[in-house]
Amino acid sequence: MTMELLCFSYACSSQNPEMVEKLKHSNKILLPESLLFELTKDNHDSLENKLYFKVSHTETEYGEVCGVHEFSAPPGVVHVPYHIMNSCSIGEGTNVKIELVAPPKGDFVKLRLHNSKEFSKLSDPKAVLEKIMSQDYPVVTQGQTIALHYPELDKVFMIDIVETQPTEIIEILNADINVDFDIALDYDEAENTEPVESNESKSQTRDVSSSIANYKLTYDMERFPGKGNRLGSN
């Protein structure tokens, strides 16, 4: 199933502010009720599972696959998170192509944190990552950058989807996925090399230097072991 709709961000929607705040840092969209009617009329098999649609620029044909939050958008309109519109060069009120797709369950994903030092300060970063991704990003595409909002601290963590398997677009909801981490964008190799200092200076800074030097090991092996994590259960 394919159709064209007018695309607007959540900032242009009449939805309640709580819903807008929840969805703007996700890849979930709002579609018109008429589309659900068409799917029901056709007795589409996908209704038994989660629905995913590729939102594409009609001229460049570049797009991203999104999940559906509700069928509550006005007739002829799709509401899309602004960060997805921006990555696809889609402006407010632009015609977009909406195409029903069925990505396979993923079995591997490699992630790259933009700000690993802040993320690793969370009490349980692995649990936070799994919970937010399964809630807000049920499907991911290799090469995209996602924005994870952690409401308890009101922080947004940017994460690159470096690699996915078995295909470039995968569903992560209820999937047993091996998670690996690429070197974070804020990783500074110079910080992990202990400088040559006098014995007195080394004594004064031993604890701090040791902490920094072992940061990458802690980040890779203890905070984010990345083996067979089940991302999502809803």
Where are these regions (language model features)?
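Beta-strand/loop-dominated core regions that host nucleotide or nucleotide-derived cofactor-binding catalytic loops
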Residues: 1-234
